[in-house]
């Protein structure tokens, strides 16, 4: 039954992932679902990703055409998101952190880093739809905050992560900078999300 469900989901994914508009509502929401739309690229080899650190925005572009845009969470000042030009080189739909997570002690769950001297079984935070662009740095599904909150990765909320995962491939260029030209034209249309009151998974 689980196999059939996954096959039906996989068959419906292209229609669900690639919609007809790059528009989103700029209103902020507190937790809950986060809807983004995406276009199917005409040539997947021309897809590129642009990240604005100052605006915490991700733009997936094909030339001047916006395929998808979404809010993101960037790294805290002590563990910043790296700047520069990169390429996606590893994708993993189901991934857990090898560094940050929990220690499970019977019925107790204690936040802990993997190497912490705390008893119990280590379980990493879920990082679904992982797209790695630099060793230990990637785009992945996770809570999105209005302020920097990650350990350097770029978090995408809910379906934004799944759609991003479908749009990029190994070799997709990624540019991460303080700002992007799209901040002025597309940035104001991006819906903000605030998961700051939501407990970590």
For each of these PLM feature ranges, what is it?
Residues 8, 44, 74, 147-150:
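Residues at structural and domain junctions
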Residues 22-105, 110-122, 128-129, 172, ...:
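Cell wall/extracellular polymer interaction/catalysis modules
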Residues 1-11:
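Bacterial N-terminal signal peptides that target proteins for export
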């Amino acid at each position: 039954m689980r196999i059939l469900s996954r096959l039906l989901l996989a068959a419906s994914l292209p229609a669900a992932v690639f919609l007809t508009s790059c528009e989103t509502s700029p209103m902020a929401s507190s937790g809950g679902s986060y809807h983004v739309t995406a276009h199917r690229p005409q040539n997947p080899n021309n897809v590129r990703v642009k990240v604005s650190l100052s605006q915490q925005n991700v733009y997936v572009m094909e030339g001047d055409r916006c395929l998808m845009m979404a809010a993101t969470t960037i790294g805290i000042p002590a563990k910043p998101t790296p700047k520069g030009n990169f390429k996606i080189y590893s994708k993993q739909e189901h991934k857990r952190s090898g560094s940050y997570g929990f220690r499970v002690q019977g019925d107790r769950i204690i936040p802990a880093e993997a190497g912490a001297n705390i008893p119990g079984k280590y379980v990493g935070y879920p990082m679904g739809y992982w797209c790695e662009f630099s060793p230990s740095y990637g785009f992945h599904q996770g809570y999105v905050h209005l302020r920097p909150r990650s350990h350097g990765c770029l978090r995408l909320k809910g379906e934004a992560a799944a759609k991003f995962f479908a749009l990029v491939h190994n070799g997709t260029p990624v540019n991460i900078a303080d700002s992007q030209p799209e901040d002025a034209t597309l940035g104001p249309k991006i819906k903000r999300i605030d998961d700051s009151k939501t407990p970590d998974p």
